[in-house]
Amino acid sequence: MVDTVIPGDMACLDADLLQLQEMSSFVLNSKPGFTQKLFDQWLSLPEAQRQVGSLLKDAVAGAPINVTGSASGSNSATIPSMFPAGSAPPLSPRSCGSPRTTKQRAPSNLGSTLKVVNEPVKEPIPQFYFQNGRPPPSEIKEQCMFRINHFFYGHMDGLQIQEFKLVTREICKLPSFFSTSLFRKIDLNNTGFVTRDAFIDFWVNGNMLIMDTTTQIFKILKQKDQSFIVKDDFKPLLKELLATHPGLEFLQSTPEFQERYAETVTYRIFYYINRSGNGRITFRELKRGNLIDAMLHADEEEDINKVLRYFSYEHFYVIYCKFWELDTDHDFLIDKENLMRYGNHALTYRIVDRIFSQVARKFTSKVEGKMGYEDFVYFILAEEDKSSVPSLEYWFKCIDLDANGIITRNEMQFFYEEQLHRMECMAQEAVLFEDILCQMIDMIGPENESHITLHDLKGSKLSGNVFNILFNLNKFMAFETRDPFLIRQERENPTLTDWDRFAHREYIRLSMEEDVEDASNGSAEVWDDSSLEAPF
């Protein structure tokens, strides 16, 4: 036998397919054991082996198999007879004289002698799943390796954290204040060094190299076994920012205010980014927000007050001072009566009650009837930036008394009644609720005029005015009189938010008050711009 291996299903004998002139298929089928011996004898012939081997090679190669012919045709000799000449056994006789037993056999093709399955050639499927992402292209990897070798040259023991800052900025293209967080991600054993091989394993082999900036930052900030970012994850980041940013150097002598600044930045980040409000920033929330751009801006801009999103020191100063003004006993907690004094008694009792009922947001102070600093940060951002989505959601929950997802006429009237009463007490011209209701409906343009949904509010640029009408008398009167100062501010700086404009006005006011106080105490020095940057 030749080396050709015939699969089992191809070596099974089908007598009808043999198409032998010497013997009928009836005889072959009636004696399977005898027939199998004949088949084995035929398969042992050299010519049969060559024929079968050729067919198998064609089948494996995917080539068309052409063995057509008939037993009586010229190609019948291509497959040899099972028996030597003159040695064929006699045929079994038919029933005598019965014409019905006589059967003329029609010629048939020899091509189906063996059932050869023409299977397609299997092509290898390229890898499509990579646990750490698709590897970087060789060109990008080579460029990165060249830069890595340059920065680690001469540092056989690795780089220390101060030396690692250049790697963070120049190779990783991340803000420099990420250096400590990135360093700790690689130096898992706290050796104080990051070697070349360890950095390559984390940044290149871990495919951090080709990830987008948002993914890189998310992986660096979050804990290894978590799929989200919590407040504590920002601590090393902000600690390094305070230690290295030129616009925050003046705070290094007052560590207590460094801590307050870091807390305020973190609260602002979670207020705008963590839309679920569960204290856990997901990758999707991080990607949808503007935090990454703000971080890159903070790293490039020496004047931290120009980084209006999250990091402005002036914004922190305003928030902290406003809280300090209300916290008369300075226990870092404020109650309802304290909050009623906010904005020169601008808020109604009814809205303050709703705030302290914690329907908009659960307080973190853990003290009954008291609002902590974090709670106040959420409140002031919601109150002074009513054009933002977090603010609309905050106040919608307060006005929606039955929490059924819509604000009805009765709910709006409930809050406006106190506004109306206050206007009458101040001898102001009162605006009837029916008139103001039509005005609010015109501003919002709800899908159903019988009620207002959160979706309706998010679709209107005037939604903040509706809330001012309902519970902030000072802003309501300013809106009614169309304060020319506010209108001019909006036209001069159309890109600024309501919060940006408020914080700027308040910072100037607070700075001037402090300057006057210093002068009255006889401690005023020659005033310059630097005093605005170092109020503490």
From Swiss-Prot:
The phenotype of cells or organisms lacking this gene is: No visible phenotype.
Q: Where is the composition biased (Polar residues)?
A: 69-79, 98-108
Where does the source fall among the domains of life? Eukaryota
Q: Which residues cross the membrane?
A: none
- The residues the record assigns to binding Ca(2+) are D400, D402, N404, E411
Disordered: region residues: 69-108, 517-536
What spans are recorded as compositionally biased (Acidic residues)?
Answer: 526-536
Instruction: Tell me which UniProt keywords the record has, alphabetically.
Output: Calcium, Metal-binding, Repeat
Q: Which residues form a coiled coil?
A: none
State the InterPro entries in the record. EF-hand-dom_pair (IPR011992), EF-hand_13 (IPR041534), EF_Hand_1_Ca_BS (IPR018247), EF_hand_dom (IPR002048)
What do we know about how this protein assembles, alone or with others?
Answer: PP2A consists of a common heterodimeric core enzyme, composed of a 36 kDa catalytic subunit (subunit C) and a 65 kDa constant regulatory subunit (PR65 or subunit A), that associates with a variety of regulatory subunits. Proteins that associate with the core dimer include three families of regulatory subunits B (the R2/B/PR55/B55, R3/B''/PR72/PR130/PR59 and R5/B'/B56 families) and cell signaling molecules. Interacts with HMGR1L and HMGR1S (via N-terminus), but not with HMG2. Interacts with PP2AA1.
Q: Quote the function comment for this protein.
A: Regulatory subunit of type 2A protein phosphatase. Involved in post-transcriptional regulation of HMGR but not in root growth regulation in response to salt.
Q: What is this protein called?
A: Serine/threonine protein phosphatase 2A regulatory subunit B''beta
